[in-house]
Amino acid sequence: MKKSFRILFISLLCFSLTGLSFTIDTANKDSLKVVFLDDPVVAKFDSMLLANFTNSESIFEGSVTSPTEAPSYSDSIYTLRIEALNKKTPIDLVFNPYVKQYIKVYTQRRRTQMSRMMGLAAFYFPMFEEVLDQFDLPLELKYLAIVESALNPRAKSWAGATGLWQFMYNTGKEYDLKISSYVDERMDPYRATVAACMYFQSSYNLYKDWSLVLASYNSGRGNVNKAIRRSGGHKNYWKIRRFLPKETRSYVPAFIAVCYAMNYADKHGISPEEPKFLHYEIDTIEVKYQIDFQYLSKIVDISISELEFLNPAYKINVIPFIDERAYHLVLPVSKMGVFVQNESEIYNHFSALDALKQKSYPKYSEEDERIVHRVRNGEYLGKIASRYGCSVSKIKKWNNLKSDAISVGQRLVLFVRPDYV
């Protein structure tokens, strides 16, 4: 579906990120010695969690996981537990040394993070399961969002993959996720989940194997197809694994480990960090006029950070009103009555602002597209800017250029209007 690039690893003391280099225990003869250095899947997990979004006091009530005790079990116990999970799903769940290294990550080295994931899962998973069921897909696919985004709906990789399900710009467009100056529907939990399910369904129709569906979600179908050809035509993930990109080689083992960790967290002394909101405590209403969070927070007595958590798709804290697309406001059930009671007053307030032009909002328009331009002979920044309808200063900002000097073959990241692509 998309090329998933390795997210830059950010080291913060509060997360104790000291476990990225380790060797698998070789006490058992059947285990492998694996050097686990700056693993791309773990780096992604940490990077997503380090975002302020999942650390906000507006989301969690407080941690209950003890950071000291981290039980470990024999390979035979892990095998029995994963076999029990495997009987409940059509996705092939196996235990091997590659899976074991990620079980250690999630149950020993990232215990606090897993506690937060369990709390966020209580909020998001009921909706995931409902949509997965509508598409007749395995419910265990919900765990993939933990591997993808650490359940952060505003997660964004340096390559541009965005949201709970990490859609790239063009792939999001392909699955009808609108991106504008106001809204990025890749960050809309429900709409992005529907899009992810559409991808899962079409990918399964192609491969008839859920492990290959997972691999293709990470690296793209093209890379999976190439790996199948290079392996001699095998259509088993473990037989084509060595021909896949580095991150994808870790992706399915990490998924299996997350399935294990979420189902056996209690056996490892991990308890959920309770979220402030649960899925049955929120309600949704379609807006009938453009509104912003600042005024809304005063009317219904809710913090802006809580509005952002419940409504992550709105980029500048404004919910637009357009004829072509319905947009919704999500509020706690306890606040929805206040909104409905004051709905006319709220809309009249913004209507008056528009009439008096006291508040200026950007025009609703499709967002510029991210492209990469390779510098050709004879090109300079001014010429490139003219070609793509942007400014030299913006090109320098996008690419962290200190001067106007560029070289032939250099790659420049540009954000341009669709008509210039």
Predicted features and spans:
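An acidic, Gly/Ser/Thr/Pro-rich helix-cap/linker signature
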Residues: 20-135
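Extracellular LysM carbohydrate-binding repeats and other cell-envelope/extracellular binding modules
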Residues: 244, 310-346, 371, 391-421
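Solvent-exposed, acidic/flexible segments
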Residues: 110, 114-121, 125, 134-137, ...
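Primarily a LysM-type cell-wall glycan-binding module
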Residues: 273-304, 360-391, 402, 407-411
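Substrate-binding clefts and substrate-entry loops adjacent to catalytic sites
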Residues: 102-116, 151-158, 166-208, 228-242
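Short, functionally critical alpha-helical segments immediately adjacent to catalytic or ligand/cofactor-binding
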Residues: 137-154, 213-218, 308-311, 395-399, ...
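Bacterial Sec-dependent N-terminal signal peptides
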Residues: 1-31
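Extracytoplasmic/secreted proteins, especially bacterial periplasmic and envelope-associated proteins
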Residues: 98-102, 116, 120-123, 127, ...
